[in-house]
């Protein structure tokens, strides 16, 4: 099912959200968002390729490095892309000034996007703008582009508040071997679009039930590192669980996991008067099962008159994540071990489901995971079991 995203303007001091697409991939993503009616967001495109930029549909377009590149592109050289952005720092600053939140979108691995993205992010942060990058990573068979992309990502991480990475390798896994190149890249553009539209909807659509505002988004996304955004839609019996599972298990975001999330935003949308408290509890319980014990969680509930009474849409934004393969450098640590005989009792506290359980602590080493007596006495958290098994 396709959605037309209508990010309604708030009546009182609406947050100003801008999206800047950099290079060929970023500019294509901007065109896709414009074509899909993502509204109440200001679009900016910036490129060193004058011919490509002239065909872009963004209201604001910036020719980067006119003197340096003569409008002929960066030649897949990120140093050229970086220098081109530095040449036009003033134009970039003027274009993004006044934003409360800036999305940077690009395809990493090329010249313009990889080189200019850290520069744009640094300018945005100097202006006090909440800065989120949503980028793609090249296919693993692309050789040099992979290394260029990784170096660019490391630089980008230093300046953005949150970073959402979409690995192109996952396109083949998610869409099948028979997918065409056009379909694959359209899918990547759609993930970029959904991330921007979903977060923007949370920020700018007021709710009369439980409202999420820009301050909530800033709390969860500021200085958080790796992030993910997912959305799910379901109808009928068990709709809350199905939509939540969809939202947290996007195959195109498979390089990160919700396990250990430090910040989460959850937005639940139904037809007027159709959200049950039991569904709210179920959604938050699923989220909290995978997240960090010190999770900063905010949730909102909104109503959409265009939705059917048996439908639910759930948007989840999780931050402070680790990429798969990242491990805690400390070999031995203290974790909560939960006695399974205690009865769990859940309640809502400050917009978040918290679980009260009888607990005690113990130090676990790697060997304890193979000791059946330890496993029998304690319920080892799933995140630790999975991490241990993957390290074998």
UniProtKB/Swiss-Prot annotation:
InterPro entries of this UniProt entry? Answer: Cell_div_FtsZ (IPR000158), Cell_div_FtsZ_CS (IPR020805), FtsZ/CetZ (IPR045061), FtsZ_C (IPR024757), Tub_FtsZ_C (IPR008280), Tubulin/FtsZ-like_C (IPR037103), Tubulin/FtsZ_2-layer-sand-dom (IPR018316), Tubulin/FtsZ_GTPase_sf (IPR036525)
What subcellular locations does the record give? Answer: Cytoplasm
Q: Where does GTP bind?
A: 24-28, 111-113, 142, 145, 189
Keyword presence, Cell division: yes
**What does the UniProt keyword field contain?**
Cell cycle, Cell division, Cytoplasm, GTP-binding, Nucleotide-binding, Septation
GO cellular component, alphabetical, reads: cell division site; cytoplasm
Q: Which NCBIfam families match?
A: ftsZ
Name of the featured protein: Cell division protein FtsZ
The gene is ftsZ
């Amino acid at each position: 099912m396709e959605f037309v995203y209508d990010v309604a303007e708030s009546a009182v001091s609406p947050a100003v959200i801008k999206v800047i697409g950099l290079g060929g991939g970023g500019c294509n993503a901007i065109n896709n968002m414009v074509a899909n009616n993502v509204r109440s967001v200001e679009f900016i495109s910036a490129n060193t390729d004058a011919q490509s930029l002239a065909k872009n549909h963004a209201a604001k377009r910036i020719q980067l490095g006119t003197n340096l590149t003569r409008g002929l592109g960066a030649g897949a050289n990120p140093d050229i892309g970086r220098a081109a952005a530095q040449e036009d720092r003033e134009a970039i600053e003027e274009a993004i000034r006044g934003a409360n939140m800036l999305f940077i979108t690009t395809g990493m691995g090329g010249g313009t996007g990889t080189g200019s993205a850290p520069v744009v992010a640094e300018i945005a942060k100097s202006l006090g703008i909440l800065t989120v990058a949503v980028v793609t990573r090249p296919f693993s068979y692309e050789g040099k582009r992979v290394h260029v992309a990784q170096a660019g990502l490391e630089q980008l991480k230093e300046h953005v508040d949150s970073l959402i990475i979409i690995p192109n390798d996952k396109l083949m896994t998610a869409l099948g071997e028979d997918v065409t190149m056009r379909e694959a890249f359209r899918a990547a553009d759609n993930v970029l679009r959904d991330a921007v539209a979903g977060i923007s909807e949370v920020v700018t659509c007021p709710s009369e039930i439980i409202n999420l505002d820009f301050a909530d988004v800033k709390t969860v996304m500021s200085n958080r590192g790796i992030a993910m955004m997912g959305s799910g839609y379901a109808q009928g019996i068990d709709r809350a669980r199905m939509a939540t599972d969809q939202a947290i298990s996007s195959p195109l975001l498979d390089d990160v996991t919700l396990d250990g999330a430090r910040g989460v935003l959850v937005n639940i949308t139904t037809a007027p008067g159709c959200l049950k408290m039991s569904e709210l509890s179920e959604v938050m319980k699923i989220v909290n099962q995978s997240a960090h014990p010190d999770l900063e969680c905010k949730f909102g509930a909104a109503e959409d008159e265009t939705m059917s009474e048996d439908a639910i849409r759930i948007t989840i934004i999780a931050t402070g994540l680790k990429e798969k393969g990242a491990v805690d450098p400390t070999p031995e640590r203290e974790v909560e071990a939960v006695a399974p005989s205690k009865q769990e009792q859940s309640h809502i506290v400050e917009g978040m489901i918290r679980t009260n359980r009888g607990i005690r602590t113990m130090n676990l080493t790697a060997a304890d995971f193979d000791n059946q007596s330890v496993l029998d006495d304690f319920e080892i958290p799933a995140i630790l079991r999975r991490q241990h098994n993957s390290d074998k």
